[in-house]
């Protein structure tokens, strides 16, 4: 499976915190969720989308579509958002570079994993079991890219435990992510991720 040629992503806290995502918040089903970086993850997600061009980004755990909207910030990328149950996003959010699917992403035979750079995981019931199964599935597939993992803080001890056991290079990006804890995991040895 092809990998990204040597790429370095330097997370710029100031740029993430200053990013204007108000146009996305206006389309959101939950406008009150679009808080500052460190309270809400959406500025981080939007900023990360600018680090890739002409790629596919997966949002696993649609709920009301906020993450999908944030990840769609860079309109040169396509976002596919997955959930097992419709919760209003597919009828309430209309954006050309966002597609909503009701299915397990692992069962989507149309995906080209060579062109997927970011996968965001935020699935219920936040027990760490599904997240670990998804990581193992991605490992078996030989996928290369970044995983965003939400709720890695002490409020969700099972996910925090899973986070602590991850052996891939990782960064706790809660400072510019969601207050419940946000982690960034690097599945690609040809790219490095660090703070600016």
Predicted features along the sequence, with ranges:
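A short alpha-helical cap/connector motif
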Residues: 1-196
């Amino acid at each position: 499976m092809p990998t990204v040629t040597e790429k370095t992503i330097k997370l710029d806290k100031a740029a993430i915190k200053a990013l204007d995502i108000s146009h996305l918040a206006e389309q959101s089903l939950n406008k009150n969720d679009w808080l500052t970086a460190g309270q809400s993850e959406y500025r981080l997600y939007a900023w990360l989308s600018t680090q890739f061009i002409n790629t596919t980004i997966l949002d696993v755990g649609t709920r009301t579509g906020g993450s999908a909207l944030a990840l769609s910030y860079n309109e040169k990328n396509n976002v596919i958002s997955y959930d097992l149950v419709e919760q209003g996003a597919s009828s309430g959010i209309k954006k050309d570079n966002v597609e909503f699917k009701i299915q397990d992403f692992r069962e989507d035979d149309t995906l080209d994993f060579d062109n997927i750079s970011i996968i965001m995981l935020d699935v219920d019931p936040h027990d760490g079991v599904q997240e670990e199964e998804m990581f193992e599935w991605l490992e078996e597939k030989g996928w290369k890219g970044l995983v965003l993992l939400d709720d890695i803080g002490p409020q969700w001890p099972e996910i925090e435990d899973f986070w602590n056991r991850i052996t891939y290079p990782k960064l706790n990006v809660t400072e510019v992510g969601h207050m419940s804890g946000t982690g960034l995991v690097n599945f690609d040895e040809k790219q490095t991720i660090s703070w600016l």
